[in-house]
Regions:
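Generic structural signal for well-ordered alpha-helices
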Residues: 4-7, 35-46, 62-65, 98-105, ...
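N-terminal binding-site loop/beta-alpha segment at the start of enzyme catalytic domains
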Residues: 1-54, 72, 90, 95, ...
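Active-site groove signature of glycoside hydrolases
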Residues: 67-89
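Beta/alpha (TIM)-barrel catalytic core signal, keyed to glycine-rich beta->alpha loops juxtaposed to Asp/Glu
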Residues: 81-226
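Eukaryotic N-terminal low-complexity, Ser/Thr- and Lys/Arg-rich leader segments
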Residues: 1-14, 32, 36, 46-67, ...
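Generic low-polarity alpha-helical segments
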Residues: 19-20, 65, 162
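Short beta-strand segments at enzyme active-site cores
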Residues: 19-20, 74-80, 116-118
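A structural motif corresponding to the C-terminal end of an alpha-helix
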Residues: 11-14, 65-73, 103-115
Length: 226
């Protein structure tokens, strides 16, 4: 619902904030919706950083907002599409992925995002097609090894693919599938008191998982969801 409270602590003014996003979307989300979710996150982030001392002075707030826009860089956006009808995180064809991926390319063209990637696409032939049929190939491919790898040879194939195409291979530990109500509430409610029902989610179309770092420094916000 957009209610996020982020405490960034003290940030050196010359160090840009590097943001990594992973967007989980269900089949109800269209490719055109992707930019909306990214813009919403940036708006919430900027509002969080420009509140308090700047709230009563529009000119100062505007200046601060421009500074923050320059410092807050979405360094990586990874797309995770919904599971198929067999309850596996797989993709039946490149034709299903491409419309969504092309929207990621538009975000790069608009300089809203620096790098883009996909999650849980471990079929080498499909990754080759993604390389051939896109203007901006994936900078990263994220895989959950335990659930996605059929054998050691598949891991080696992915590593070799990454080396050949200069693609960063990343490992994740997210629940697969992530957008089921039970799995999502389990992640969102971690740390809540037992019996808490305030943050329970009944219906969801998309979830953004984010991490924020200060360049040359440490992780400011390791992981969060909205």
């Amino acid at each position: 619902n957009g209610n996020i409270d982020i405490d960034f602590g003290r940030i050196e003014p010359k160090n840009p904030l590097l943001i990594s996003l992973k967007l989980f979307i269900s089949k109800t989300v269209t490719p055109d919706d992707i930019e909306k979710y990214v813009n919403t996150f940036q708006e919430i982030l900027i509002k969080t950083l420009t509140r308090s001392d700047y709230a009563n002075d529009c000119s100062i707030a505007t200046t601060k907002k421009q500074e923050i826009c320059q410092k807050c860089k979405i360094d990586m956006l990874i797309l995770s599409l919904t599971k198929d009808g067999n309850h596996h995180q797989t993709y039946s064809s490149i034709d299903y992925i491409l419309p969504y991926y092309k929207k990621l390319e538009e975000l790069v063209d608009k300089k809203l995002v620096k790098n883009i990637g996909v999650s849980d696409v471990s079929d080498i032939s499909m990754l080759e097609k993604l390389q051939e049929q896109t203007k901006i190939p994936p900078a990263a491919i994220q895989v959950k090894y335990v659930s996605s790898m059929r054998c050691d040879s598949q891991i080696l194939d992915l590593i070799q693919f990454g080396e050949k195409h200069d693609v960063l291979m990343l490992r994740h530990s997210d629940e697969v599938p992530f957008l089921t109500r039970e799995q999502l509430n389990s992640n969102v409610c971690k740390g809540c008191e037992k019996g808490c029902h305030i943050c329970r989610i009944d219906n969801v179309d998309a979830v953004l998982k984010y991490s924020i770092t200060s360049k040359w420094h440490s992780v400011l916000l390791g992981k969060g969801y909205f």
